[in-house]
A protein has these predicted regions:
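Short beta-strand "wing" residues that participate in macromolecule-binding interfaces
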Residues: 94, 101, 293, 340-343
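Conserved beta-strand edge residues that scaffold enzyme active sites
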Residues: 99-100, 299, 347-348
Length: 360
């Protein structure tokens, strides 16, 4: 007869038997397991995106593992594993034996949708993933790992056009959704001309001009980036309200704008360059003008939040900058001459808040 293994009090006749000593109370190791395997979830998403799984399922009747295997050229075994993994991550749902996109994947992971996020997924997979694999090297050397400092002077002047196009397409998808939230959190009704400093693809300008019917904007960036923005502006049908201007924002800023936007820019640069840029912004603005710094802000205690803190490590492998705190930005703004400084918070992929300063 099998012996029961459940632990119970010893019978009376064995009262002198010492109980097994209790194991010391330990915290659960489950969070460590989740951290250690976090890349499993990302690579599942990246592989599904590369196989265009979500495009295959868009608006359709769904699929089975066998149908997916035949459609995209997979063996049925991994096809089933991929579908199961995506369902577990909330990217697919299964009803009546068929897998379909969830509202999340249908809105953001299908190519051609207005707020398509797949560009960022692709960039993270093809550019950032390898660099993060060398994070310890970056920590020891204080140098980036996603590009070679011996070949180029910064992330933004690389010679690989494919990687540059991938970067800006990724930034456009993240910026489009972030700009929408920024426009809801910051009141721009009383401004007429916005200068988007380092405006990239123009995503912020396009979204903000859609929200504010009287607003006009200028995307100010390097010539090859401004050309990308011009194409996006044309696609959006906003060439009558958004223009591009070429230049180096560390050297000059165009005048005749009453609000400046620095969206996901200052985290790329060190403190000295950021302070100089804010002084240049102050000088270029009229009295009553404002500057809006939109960023993933680290809290003033420098304990989180996790997206901002980890983004700061991403800046280590990519740039000379880091993610800064509201207190740091506020001090720099005050030093430059801005007043009535405030921080507003919101929830978006590329930023969690904005620090705003007014020129007296």
């Amino acid at each position: 007869m099998a012996r029961k293994l459940s632990r119970t009090a010893p019978p009376a006749k064995h009262a002198n038997v010492q109980p097994i000593s209790a194991t010391p109370e330990l915290p659960s190791a489950v969070p460590l397991m989740a951290l250690s395997t976090g890349f499993w979830a990302f690579k599942t998403l990246a592989a599904a995106h590369e196989l265009d799984l979500f495009g295959h399922l868009a608006g359709g009747p769904g699929t089975t593992a066998g149908e997916l295997a035949q459609a995209v050229g997979l063996h049925p075994r991994p096809a089933e594993m991929l579908l199961t993994g995506c369902a577990a991550l909330g990217l697919l749902e299964k009803t009546e034996g068929r897998y379909r996109n969830t509202p999340l994947s249908e809105a953001y992971l299908v190519r051609g949708k207005p707020y398509y996020f797949g560009g960022f997924v692709q960039m993270a997979d093809k550019r950032l993933y390898a660099g993060w694999g060398r994070l310890t090297e970056a920590l020891r050397t204080n140098r980036p790992t996603t590009w070679d400092p011996a070949v180029q002077s910064s992330l933004f002047d690389g010679e690989d056009p494919t990687m540059l196009a991938l970067f800006w397409e990724a930034m456009h998808s993240v910026s489009t959704m972030t700009a929408r939230k920024l426009g809801e959190a910051v009141d721009l009704r009383y401004f007429r001309r916005l200068l988007d400093i380092g405006g990239g693809s123009g995503a912020y300008d396009i979204e903000l001009c859609k929200q504010y019917g009287e607003l006009h904007a200028t995307v100010f960036d390097l010539p090859h980036v401004a050309a990308i923005a011009a194409g996006k502006i044309t696609e959006a049908g906003l060439t009558d309200r958004i223009e591009t201007a070429c230049g180096n924002f560390f050297e000059q800023l165009p005048g005749d704008h009453d609000v400046h936007l620095l969206s996901m820019i200052l985290h790329d640069w060190d403190e000295a360059k950021n302070r100089a840029l804010l002084r240049r912004s102050f000088d270029a603005l009229p009295s009553g003008g404002a500057v809006v710094i939109s960023e993933l802000l680290v809290n003033d205690e420098k304990t989180g939040p996790a997206p901002a803190a980890l983004m700061s490590l991403n800046m280590l492998i990519e740039t000379e900058g880091r993610n800064y705190t509201p207190a740091e930005y506020s001090a720099w703004l005050e030093e430059a001459g801005f007043r009535h400084i405030e921080t507003v918070w919101f929830d978006a992929p590329g930023a969690n808040g904005a620090v705003i300063g007014r020129k007296p």
